[in-house]
Each structure stands twice: as structure tokens, then as C-alpha cells.
From Swiss-Prot:
Record keywords, A-Z: Decarboxylase, Lyase, Pyrimidine biosynthesis
This protein's GO CC annotations: cytosol
Annotated EC: 4.1.1.23
Role played: Catalyzes the decarboxylation of orotidine 5'-monophosphate (OMP) to uridine 5'-monophosphate (UMP).
Class of enzymatic activity (EC top level): lyase
Stored Gene3D superfamilies: Aldolase class I
PROSITE patterns: OMPDECASE (PS00156)
Protein name: Orotidine 5'-phosphate decarboxylase
Coiled coil: none
Annotated family: Belongs to the OMP decarboxylase family. Type 1 subfamily.
Catalytic activity: orotidine 5'-phosphate + H(+) = UMP + CO2
The keyword Lyase is annotated on this UniProt entry: yes
SS bonds (residue pairs): none
Amino acid sequence: MKDQKVIVALDYDRQADALAFVDKIDPSSCRLKVGKEMFTLFGPEFVKELHKRGFSVFLDLKFHDIPNTCSKAVRAAAEMGVWMVNVHASGGERMMTASREILEPYGKDRPLLIGVTVLTSMEQQDLAGIGLDIAPQEQVKRLAALTKNSGLDGVVCSAQEASMLKADLGKYFKLVTPGIRPVGSDVGDQKRIMTPVDAIISGSDYLVIGRPITQAENPSQVLNDINLSLAPVL
């Protein structure tokens, strides 16, 4: 199966609505992201439903805890069979290393382990508010380097940082980019955004797209259009 670049961010508070949407799209066209709200509401059984339908799942729970607790949560995600799981890079090198090491017994079947750098809603004043006198881009660079040094597979970052991180950390270090809006879409609550084609050109490996697909009249067509637009730049 080809390496789908689009990850559709599911955002529903009713499982029936989520599955009704999922049944309109093809697992060959995208992967799916399940975040904190949906996982708290519906639990592992919902992830199993998505797996039954043939979808790869990015479990976006952003674990951040002491190394022992965080790594065990990552192992629980691996037991669920998810394709990707993430942890907050600000949890530090020991936490990330423990999380990576606990996945080693899974071999080729282990999920990708990704670090979260700076949330795309965060601006300089937000960082200042938590005691970080640093530009968001510099904090992203610092945390991304720490993530790579901890042996993780990549980071979540905004598309604006992608070319810089590819240059610094190499082409095999995966960049997962939220804040992607197809041309003509509403910006929503993301501060740092970019179109799918621009993001891939900038170095993003996977594109997280939510409402422009989930709220579309014909989500399958929107996905098809995005994938067609990406074909020349892959």
C-alpha cells in the first residue's frame, strides 16, 4: 500500500457520527487521527472499529509523564496496533528514550513514535507566559533536536518549520504537520497554517487535516483532490 500523506483529524462527540463519516472515505486515501476527546469518550474499542475498516490510526494523546508511566502508556498504544503515537518532547530525553526502548520488542510492527514540539496555537506571548523567553521557532528547533537525540522517529511541527528541520535533522526524520488548510479553507484556530502542496514542498512527511475534510459535503472528493494535487511533488 502506498504511503498515504494525509491524516484526517477526527473531531466528533458522537461515535455514530464519526463512523458515518469514516464510512464515506477510503482507507487507501488517508490515515485517521484520534485525539484526547474522542479517545476519552469512546476508548480503545473505537480504535478497533477504525482498524476493522482498514484504517491506520495516529493516536494523538501527547503523553507527558514520568518516564515509567509515559513509556507504559506508549506500550499500551502499541498493543492496540496503532500506526503512530506521540509524546511531549518537553517531557525530556529520559522520558522519550524510555518510550522508544519499550517499543523495541515490537520490531517492524511497532508504531512510529513522534515528539510534540510547540503546539501550533502557541505564539511568542504564550511561551513567555510559561516562562520561556524564546521565539516559537527556536523552541521547536531545540525540542526537535532533543527528540532526534532520544531516538524517536520524528516530530509534530508547523509547516513553516519543516524546511529548517529537514535541513537540520535529515530527510529520514519524519515531520508531521497540523494546521494544513487546502486552498480556500477557513483558517480556524490554528495560528501557523499552509496548503498541502506547500507543506510537502517545505519538507513535511504527513499532513494533518481536519474540518476541511470532515465538514465537506463530499469528503472522498476533497481527499481525492488533495492527493491528486500532491502527486506531482511527491
